[in-house]
Amino acid sequence: MTAYSKHYNAIVIGIGAMGSATCYQLARRNKRVLGIERFDIPHDLGSSHGYTRIIRLAYYEHPSYIALLRRSYELWADIERTSGEQLLYRTGSLDCGPADSWVFKGSLQSCVEHDLPHEVLTGAQVSERYPGYRLPRENLAVFQPDGGFLVPERGTVAYVEAAHALGAEIHGREALLDWEPWGDAVRVFTDRDEYTADALVFTAGGWNQNVLPFLRGLAVPERQVLAWLQPTRPELFRPERFPVFNCLVPEGRYYGFPVFAVPGFKFGRYHHFEETGEAETLSREAFREDEDVLRDFAARYFPDGAGPTMILKACLFTNTPDRHFLIDLHPDHPQVSFAAGFSGHGYKFASVIGEIMADLAERQATRHDISLFNLARFTGQVSQLHQQKMDMLARGAWTPAAHGPAHPLYRGDSQRGREVPGGALGRLHDHRQPATVRPSGDSGRWSLTDTADPRHWTDSDVKPFW
C-alpha cells in the first residue's frame, strides 16, 4: 500500500446528499476520506437541489422505512447542531387520497403500527383547516405533525463543511474515469489523478449505472419537473399554514410544499411523463407541456396557489423496478459498496444513508436493517453482506437485539423481532389486499379491516406503491 502516497481509508464517488453525509460520517470516525464529485458542490444536475425536499414520518411505502426515518430525524438534528443552521422545517404532512387508496391506507397503517401521532381528516376538513387546499370532499387524509421539509443545497454544504472540519478531502469538478480492485483495496482513476483506498463507496445518483454495470436497468434515470407558482393568496401557502403533501388524485400522484426561499408554491407529479434515459442526456429544460400538466393540477386542487409561474425546473429521479432503494456491497468486491435507485423518495434519508454507507465502508456490515434494499432481489446474485446474514440465520446466531430484523416486514420498535410476513399488516404494506377504512367504536379513531383472503388474490389486487 505504501507505493501510493495518495491512499485513503475510503473514497466516495458522488458528493450530493448521500455522498456528503457519507464523507462526514467517515470523517467523524477518524477515517482518511476522499470525496470526488464531477460537477460543482452543490450542483443542480442531479437529485439534491430544488430549495426544498419533503421529510415525513408517516410512510405508506413499506414498514421497514420507519426505523430508518427515526434515525434520519436524529441525524438531521445532529448536523443542524454541528453546522448551527436550521435544515429541517416542520409543517406537518398530509397523505391524501380516496378512502380505499394505498396512499391513505398505507400512511394510516404506518401511524397505527408505529404509534405515531396522527389525525384522519376528510377533504372538507383539510380545506377548512388549511384553506390553500381544495381536495375532493370525500377524500381522506392522514395528518402527521412531524412531517415537513429539508433544505437540500444547504444540507449538502453543511455536511461538506463538517467533513472538511474533521479532515476530509473533497474535490469538485473531478470526473471518475475508471476504478479497479487492487487486492483487498481499490485503485481509482480520475481526469486529475490516481488514488488508492481500502474501501470505495458509490453514491453517484443517476450516474451509478455507468460505473457499476450490474445496475443498468435496475437504477434508471428519469426526468422529473417541478413548478413554483406565485399564489394569489400567499398567506395561505406559508409554512405555518400549509403542510407538505402527497396526494393521489385521478390525474396522478402529486407532492408539494409551502412557499419557501423563492416566491412560489412548489409541487410536482411523481414520474411526470415517465421519460427515462441516460443521466447525461436527459433534458434539464422545462417546456410548456410540463407547465400545462402541473398548472391544471394546481388550478383544480390549489386554486389560490395557481398564479403566475415563477420557476419551472427539471431534476432526476433514479428508479428501481420496485421503487425501493438499492444499498449493498458489490457482489464480487466487498470493499466496494453502493447506494442507488432512491426512486423519488430518498433525500429525507440522506443523513442515515451516510451512516449506513460509512458502516459498509468500515466493516462491510451495518447496524441498520437494509434487507429490503439488497441487490439479490433483482439479480439473484447475493452479496457478501447478505450471505453473512443468511449464514448467521442458519446457525441461529442472528438475534434482532444485536443485529436488527432478519426480515424486512417487521413491526415497530415496541415489537421488534416479531415477523409479520404473512399477516394483514405485511400484506397491507405490500398493497396486495383490499381493506376498508372505518371509525373504530365510539372513539372516532380510524382503523383498517381486512376484506379479502390472500388465497383469493388476483393480479388486479397486486398494486405496487408507485
Where in the sequence are the language-model features?
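Dinucleotide-binding Rossmann-like beta1-alpha1 core, especially the glycine-rich loop
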Residues: T52-R129, N139
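Active-site substrate-recognition segment that forms the wall
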Residues: Y24-R28, G84-R90, E194-Y195, A199, ...
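Helical element adjacent to the flavin cofactor pocket in flavoenzyme catalytic cores
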Residues: F143-A199, T203
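Beta1/beta-strand and adjacent pyrophosphate-binding region of the FAD-binding site
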Residues: Y4-M18, L34
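C-terminal catalytic lobe of FAD-dependent flavoproteins
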Residues: D296-H403, H407, R411-D413, G423-L425, ...
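Glycine-rich FAD pyrophosphate-binding loop
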Residues: A27-S48
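Short beta-strand to alpha-helix junction loop
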Residues: A67, D95-V103, F143-A162, L282-D290
